[in-house]
Structures are given as structure tokens and as C-alpha cells.
């Protein structure tokens, strides 16, 4: 047993799973795996009872994850406040669009988290809401806006990064060579999160029937982005 419990990789897994983001994204991955299996089994001709087992698992995991929205609402409200302090005066000479994009993103995320929390209270019947379906739709719209804002921010950061790389490439000093390596590493991070946000954005867009894709694609996108998040948490927990 000591071989298992004292194994560095085992200890690393436990340390990672002790963090809330890692647990949430792991549950999210399982949620979309259940969604993918229910979709595959349905179109594969499996019995309705078998399909419903996986749909029920997906629904239960989704329901339990909504409770995490309590902390997320407070977190995003705090971010919105600090983002508002960074908003630039339109008459100022600063042309950076990031503060405005960040403010829009966090307002939208706050709206989505609030809608999720209301949905949780409604389903538990602690605070029934007669407009739960409309609020759920608004929540999906907020999520789509937030993720598309994140994509826009990624495009803006990529543009700025490209300018810096071009400038650093034109210099031949050792200092600029180190700076270039840092910028190239930063570029990989920007592209990673841009891809993640773009894939995540397809989920609410599909649920709102704006993007015409099947549940299999949505589930695959959800699994991919969840594993991407788990990977980042894994790297960060070393």
C-alpha cells in the first residue's frame, strides 16, 4: 500500500483534487461524458431506459454543480466592481479595449451564475420561481456573451502579442532574445485559452439554437474544455 500512497503522482492527484476548480471541472467532464453516452446510445438504438440512466446522471451532476454558483456570484460581483474602476474615460488617450471587454465578460458571468443559482433554488423547491425557464434562457445568453467576450479579449491580446514579437524579433540583443521567448510562451497561453473559450461558447449557442450542432458535438466540446481546465490545474499544482 505504501507504494501507492507514497507515490508522487498519487500525492499530486490528491493535491489537485483538493482544489475546488479541479473538482468542478472533473464533475463537468463526467457530466458531458454522460451526455455523450446518452446521445450515442439513443442514436445507436439502445432502449429508452438505458438512455434515461445516462440522462439522469447528466442531470444530477449538472444540478449538484449549480450549488457552486453561490460563491461564483459573489466572486464575479467583486470582479465587476474592480473592472468598473479600470474602465477608461472615452475622452482619454488610452485606446486599450481590454478593460471594457473584461467588464462586459464579468457582468455576463455574474448574470449566468445568478441564473444558475436561481435554477438550483427552484429545483430544490426552497424558493420556487414561476419564471425559471425564462431565467434559464437569460443565463445561457449571459454565458454566450461572457465566452464570446473572452474570445474577443483573446483576439485583442493575440494582436498585441504579435506586435511585441515583431518588435522583439527586429532586435538582436540577448535581452530581447529572452523577451522573445517569454512572448512566444505567452502566445501559446493566449491561443490555448482562446481555443478553450471558443469551444465552450458553442455549448450555450447550441442550447439557444443559434448554432446548429447536435448533442454529440456539444458533449465532445464540453469534455474537451473540461479536460483542458483539469490539465491547467494539474500543471499549476506542481
From Swiss-Prot:
InterPro entries listed in its UniProt record: PEX11
Keywords from the UniProt entry: Membrane, Mitochondrion, Peroxisome, Peroxisome biogenesis
GO cellular component: mitochondrion; peroxisomal membrane
Pfam families named among the record's database cross-references: PEX11
Record carries keyword Membrane: yes
GO biological process, one term: peroxisome fission
Signal peptide interval: none
Stretches of the chain forming a coiled coil according to its record: none
Keyword DNA-binding part of the UniProt annotation: no
Predominant localisation class: mitochondrion
Localization per record: Mitochondrion; Peroxisome membrane
Topological relation to the membrane, as annotated: Peripheral membrane protein
Protein's job: Involved in peroxisomal proliferation. Promotes peroxisome division and biogenesis.
Entry's family note: Belongs to the peroxin-11 family.
Name the UniProt record assigns to this protein: Peroxisomal biogenesis factor 11
Amino acid at each position: 500500500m505504501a507504494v501507492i500512497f507514497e507515490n508522487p503522482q498519487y500525492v499530486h492527484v490528491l493535491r489537485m483534487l483538493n482544489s475546488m476548480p479541479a473538482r468542478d471541472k472533473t464533475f463537468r467532464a463526467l457530466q458531458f461524458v454522460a451526455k455523450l453516452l446518452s446521445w450515442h446510445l439513443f442514436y445507436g438504438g439502445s432502449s429508452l431506459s438505458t438512455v434515461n440512466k445516462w440522462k439522469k446522471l447528466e442531470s444530477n451532476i449538472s444540478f449538484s454543480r449549480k450549488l457552486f454558483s453561490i460563491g461564483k456570484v459573489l466572486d464575479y460581483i467583486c470582479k465587476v466592481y474592480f473592472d468598473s474602476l479600470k474602465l477608461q474615460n472615452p475622452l482619454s488617450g488610452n485606446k486599450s479595449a481590454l478593460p471594457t471587454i473584461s467588464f462586459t465578460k464579468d457582468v455576463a458571468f455574474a448574470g449566468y451564475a445568478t441564473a444558475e443559482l436561481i435554477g438550483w433554488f427552484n429545483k430544490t423547491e426552497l424558493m420556487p420561481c414561476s419564471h425559471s425557464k425564462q431565467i434559464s434562457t437569460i443565463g445561457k445568453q449571459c454565458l454566450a456573451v461572457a465566452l464570446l467576450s473572452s474570445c474577443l479579449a483573446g483576439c485583442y491580446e493575440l494582436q498585441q502579442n504579435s506586435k511585441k514579437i515583431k518588435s522583439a524579433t527586429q532586435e538582436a540583443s540577448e535581452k530581447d532574445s529572452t523577451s522573445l521567448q517569454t512572448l512566444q510562451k505567452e502566445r501559446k497561453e493566449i491561443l490555448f485559452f482562446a481555443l478553450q473559450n471558443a469551444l465552450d461558447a458553442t455549448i450555450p449557442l447550441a442550447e439557444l439554437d443559434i448554432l446548429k450542432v447536435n448533442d454529440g458535438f456539444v458533449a465532445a466540446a464540453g469534455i474537451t474544455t473540461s479536460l483542458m481546465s483539469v490539465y491547467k490545474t494539474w500543471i499549476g499544482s506542481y
